[in-house]
Structure formats: structure tokens, C-alpha cells
A protein has these predicted regions:
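Short alpha-helical Gxxx[C/S/T] motif in the catalytic ATP-binding
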Residues: 70, 74
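Acidic ATP/Mg2+-coordinating residue in the GHKL
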Residues: 42
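A short beta-strand-to-loop motif within the catalytic HATPase_c
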Residues: 63, 87-91, 101
Length: 107
């Protein structure tokens, strides 16, 4: 199930930057103080500030035709496995999602 989180974030990142002249999606994996971390970043148009506190709310979406359940399911999966998901974004510059996993579980 944790693989589903990564797949969803990658899909979202690709969609977010597809209209950029030079789309870029980056994935980094590392340990922060012994905790496994994966980040998924894109250079899309970012998330507007007024939407930042809603991105993990079920059925909230800013995408045409989106269901709004993807990121809420991602958070549920990460929480269920003792991990976490967070997001930072800057309009016109892009978005980074950070996954932190329990020390005993890695993808």
C-alpha cells in the first residue's frame, strides 16, 4: 500500500508540471536522523496558499475532473503504517511532498 502513495505522488507531480516548458520531477530518498525519507518534487505552478490546508481533505481538488481522494488516501496509508506525509509549495515554483517512514519499514 505504501507503494500506492509514491505512485500517486509521482502521477500528481507529472500532471502538475506537464505544461511547463521544461517539466521536472525529482525523487530523493535519504535518512534524516535515522528516519527513512522520500521526497517527490515538481516544478509545476504550485498550490495556492488558500488551498494548502485542504490538500489532504477528502474530496477537495483543484484539478479539473479530479476526485479529490488521492492525497487523503495517501495520508491515511502513511498514518496507518506509522509514517507521515507533508507538503510545501510555492506558487509558480513547484511543490514538494515529503514521506517519512517508521525506522523499521521502508518501501
Amino acid at each position: 500500500r505504501q507503494e500506492q502513495v509514491l505512485i500517486n505522488l509521482l502521477k500528481n507531480a507529472v500532471e502538475a508540471c506537464q505544461e511547463r516548458p521544461y517539466p521536472e520531477v525529482r525523487v530523493n530518498a535519504f535518512r534524516r536522523e535515522g528516519v527513512p525519507v522520500i521526497t517527490v518534487s515538481d516544478n509545476g505552478y504550485g498550490i495556492v496558499p488558500e488551498a494548502m490546508d485542504k490538500v489532504f481533505v477528502p474530496f477537495f481538488t483543484t484539478k479539473q475532473g479530479g476526485s479529490g481522494i488521492g492525497l487523503s488516501v495517501c495520508r491515511q496509508i502513511m498514518n496507518r503504517h506509522g509514517g507521515s506525509i507533508s507538503v510545501i509549495s510555492e506558487e509558480e515554483k513547484g511543490t514538494t511532498f515529503t514521506l517519512q517512514f517508521p525506522q523499521t519499514r521502508v518501501l
